Amino acid sequence: MKEFKNKDYATEIRQKIPGYDVMLDVIFRGVLLRLAPGLKVDKVLALASQTDELNGLASLFPKAGVTVVEPSEAMLQELKSQVHLPQAEYLNSRFEEAVLPSAYQICSCLLVLQFVENPSLFLRKIYDSLSEGGLLILSFFSNQQLGYWKTLASELGANQQQVQRTYENQAGLMNSLSPQEVADMLEEAGFT
């Protein structure tokens, strides 16, 4: 998993990922809010999560233990200073190398998959970390919309040099994933 060290990441992501807050609203208020009453959740696994994501999970599952796996020490410290979850365990590790029990009812993996070295193995490890019937909350950046992204991110005020650099170096910065490729990898990992 790629390591991010920018403390302004939470602000910049909203400029770089058009619809970031809409994505969070759909996930937490549109889907999980409706599912939460019927779910028995004791443990949540959060991979490279941001403040709003952790707060959303904590508000829906206040009694659940949360394990946060983050490869960047700087980002992990930033999370700890902004999110106060007494029941949280914070691991400064790449998820691929973390030793975890296979007992999580929910795994949150938002905008991470495109940065991992081997997405298939990453998804398999997530599957193995979930309890039977566990829920994966997954979003990823698809290269199929890169031109649209460049225009919209620029219009939303993202740093022009960063946008252009990301656009030009997309293949070197992140995996090129299509929705169908991810669907196939999920199926291969065991998800239904």
List PLM regions with ranges.
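A short acidic, Gly/Pro-enriched loop at the edge of an enzyme's catalytic core
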Residues: 96-107
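A short SAM/SAH-binding and catalytic strip from SAM-dependent methyltransferases
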Residues: 105-120, 142
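N-terminal, positively charged/glycine-rich alpha-helical extensions of SAM-dependent methyltransferases
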Residues: 1-10
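Class I SAM-dependent methyltransferase SAM/SAH-binding core
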Residues: 40-97
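A short glycine-rich, Lys/Arg-flanked "PGG" loop and its adjoining helix->strand segment in the class I
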Residues: 120-135
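Conserved class I S-adenosyl-L-methionine
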Residues: 135-161
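Short alpha-helix
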Residues: 172-189
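Conserved alpha-helix/loop element of class I SAM-dependent methyltransferases that forms part
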Residues: 18-40
